[in-house]
Amino acid sequence: MIPGEFVFGDGDIEINAGAVRLELPIVNTGDRPVQVGSHVHVPQANGALEFDRAAAHGYRFDIPAGTAIRFEPGVAQHVRLIPLGGAREVHGLTLDPPGRLDAS
């Protein structure tokens, strides 16, 4: 084995297997491209993105970690979302972060 090498088993790995998925159309109404990362709480994304923010509450993009989706000005895209995992708390992404996403 080479130091740092990864040895994977046979077959494919499905990311976010078993996660509830939500599809939403998003359009960039601004005049510049907007890029949003994989683990951003989607409702807190750039204000130039037009979509149902209430429906997206508690969700992130269903894309691999460390990647992003780019929204070009005036272009609508259908995106797939999955629920944020872990402690489901969002802090500091905007001036009004929601904190705990689930009522307790």
Curated annotation (Swiss-Prot):
InterPro entries in the record: Urease_beta-like (IPR002019), Urease_betasu_sf (IPR036461), Urease_subunit (IPR050069)
Record GO terms (molecular function): urease activity
GO cellular component: urease complex
Pathways per UniProt: Nitrogen metabolism; urea degradation; CO(2) and NH(3) from urea (urease route): step 1/1
UniProtKB keywords: Cytoplasm, Hydrolase
Chief localization: cytoplasm
Catalytic activity: urea + 2 H2O + H(+) = hydrogencarbonate + 2 NH4(+)
Record localization: Cytoplasm
GO biological process, one term: urea catabolic process
Enzyme Commission number: 3.5.1.5
Sequence similarity: Belongs to the urease beta subunit family.
Subunit structure, as described in the record: Heterotrimer of UreA (gamma), UreB (beta) and UreC (alpha) subunits. Three heterotrimers associate to form the active enzyme.
HAMAP family according to UniProt: Urease_beta
Protein name, per record: Urease subunit beta
Organism placement in taxonomy: Bacteria, Bacillati, Actinomycetota, Actinomycetes, Mycobacteriales
Gene field: ureB
